């Protein structure tokens, strides 16, 4: 297994040349966790090769207004898209998702699916979240998240804090060493990012929340004097 790192100096963009030519399976999140970077659809299509399966995890694509860059509507041999219902609808305990792709590939995977792999509550949630009435609600949620995300990123930018421009319901920011613990002491929880390959303890992942909650985060951040990125 080869882990391909997306570097901050390149805006966490994927370098397709970094993927080994002989890789028969390539898995990538789009938007990627924890950077929130939305990789161009053409770049992901270009990863296909004879004898290779490309799996694109679009668990956070619902947060992108209009789902720009999604490959879920395309059917290419050698390409499978994984989608989740638990992120956008805030139902993590349901554990429901689905795949889309070439009919032959989907049938091959279905034949190997574990019996009773989806619970009755998960089935009910899936039906509800994919219904016609859910579609406008999903669009509204994406638009609202975009406004909240802009507010968060604007506050980070105004404070001179380095962050990765995000298309996801979170933002990766470089608050400095000790920020995670210092914020927690003030009642604010952010996700430590040093558990992700290629990142250190200066980075944290911040959830996109309503402006009122985001202002509480900024108040705590200002109080701990972590206003500039540190190495």
Regions from the PLM with identified roles:
Residues 52, 78-79, 188:
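Short, conserved active-site loop motifs that form the nucleotide-linked donor/cofactor pocket
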Residues 101, 173-176, 208-210:
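Short beta-strand-to-loop capping motifs
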Residues 150-174, 194-201:
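Conserved small-domain helix->loop->beta segment predominantly found in fold-type I
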Residues 42-50, 70-75, 108:
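Catalytic-core regions built around general acid/base machinery
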């Amino acid at each position: 297994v080869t882990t391909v790192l997306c570097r901050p100096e390149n805006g966490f963009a994927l370098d397709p040349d970094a993927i080994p030519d002989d890789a028969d399976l390539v898995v990538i999140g789009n938007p990627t966790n924890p950077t929130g970077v939305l990789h161009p659809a053409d770049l992901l299509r270009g990863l296909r090769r004879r004898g290779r399966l490309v799996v694109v995890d679009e668990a956070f694509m619902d947060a992108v207004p209009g789902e720009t860059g999604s490959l879920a509507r395309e059917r290419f041999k050698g390409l499978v898209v994984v989608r989740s219902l638990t992120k956008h609808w805030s139902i993590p305990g349901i554990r429901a998702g689905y795949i889309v792709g070439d009919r032959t590939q989907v049938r091959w995977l279905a034949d190997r699916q574990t019996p009773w792999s989806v619970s009755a509550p998960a089935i009910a949630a899936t039906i509800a979240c994919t219904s016609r009435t859910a579609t406008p609600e999903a669009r509204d949620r994406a638009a609202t998240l975009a406004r909240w995300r802009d507010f968060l990123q604007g506050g980070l930018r105004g404070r001179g804090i380095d962050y990765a421009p995000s298309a996801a319901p979170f933002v990766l920011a470089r608050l400095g060493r000790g920020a995670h613990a210092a914020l927690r002491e003030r009642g604010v929880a952010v996700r430590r990012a040093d558990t992700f390959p290629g990142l250190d303890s200066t980075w944290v992942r911040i959830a996109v929340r309503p402006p009122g909650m985001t202002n509480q985060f900024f108040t705590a951040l200002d109080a701990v004097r972590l206003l500039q990125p540190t190495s």
